[in-house]
């Protein structure tokens, strides 16, 4: 993962961690980090990690301030969705993906036969996650995860990941020097976090190692394996861009409403290309990230399978759209709005502070817009009779600023904001998904 240029100093919760790291003298630095590392040993030992592996992996550990900073930059949530999709589904990425489809035609055919997962989706995930292996991340995974723990940035997420990473080293699938990845510990061509690797990675070529770092067959097979076990349905589309009847406000339909495609068609929601739905009995929900101002989609079960890979719906949309482009489809028919102001860190932090004041969110505001914040935004929108898209816009921020918070409100409990790809069990039509690889795509 690249370093974020010209990043602003982070001023709250995790921001103080960055400033504290920079301000501590080297002696304090080392003492605090080593005490933290030693406190991790009992859990690692209980998980079967040998002391020699633990010591070798964490010898001389110091926290990485860049990891703390990057944890606060997740483009799935802080960039307008149109801008995010333009970057991830560029003409160049489509062109390269088509070349990869041709180069690995035999491998992808065997994976389709074995796992039933569409080859275009497998390659699209590869393209979105690491730009086809050219940008897999250059941070030492052990150091990144230990930093997230020892700075308190995302300790709840990172501790089981670190222990799993140590067990991967112990098994011999990869060397410590080669175990590089993202700030969140996501690894290899298709960016598995350690716990997902341990459960779902595949040794496709039979050499005794599940090498997602340097072995493309292993990496792509692992992705197919993970999607299949996440509920992928063979032969089903991920979704369709649709046209809605004039005057119909897609924001007024809950994303949890599942109906057969034939039912949606009966009320005038049809594919933008005029073609019939391939399997009209398949159930779908209406997804309109920008309401009537942008494209609308009917998304099916396979969209939710992609959400297991990354909980951000904008990510799943990027994968689905790139897969369509690789198949020969064109750009979105309806344009994305370009007039939405990108909230600054200070504005995002203020947004969270106001949500907390209204009893919709707990914790300290840090400007990280993750699943808990998005759900709080939706709850507020519902309470005011607004269109429910969960988008923290400047207009909505101004509305919150003008409205005094209710008196004696008990804050709603929320979970720690996790990296973009980490969520909870997928129980609703577009509910947060279970944990998956956690690289934040930047390009």
Each model region followed by its residue ranges:
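Bacterial N-terminal signal peptides that target proteins for export
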Residues: 2-16
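N-terminal signal peptide c-region/cleavage motif recognized by signal peptidases
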Residues: 23-25
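Boundary at the C-terminal end of the N-terminal hydrophobic targeting segment
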Residues: 28-30
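Mature N-terminal segment immediately following signal peptide/propeptide cleavage
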Residues: 32-51, 55
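A general alpha-helix detector
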Residues: 36-43, 107, 144, 351, ...
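Catalytic glycan-binding domains that act on GlcNAc-containing polysaccharides
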Residues: 49-281, 294-299, 303-323, 327-345, ...
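Proline-rich, low-complexity linker regions of envelope-associated factors in Gram-negative bacteria
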Residues: 331-335, 395, 401-443
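Short acidic, glycine/serine/threonine-rich helix-capping segments at coil-helix boundaries
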Residues: 343-348, 356-400
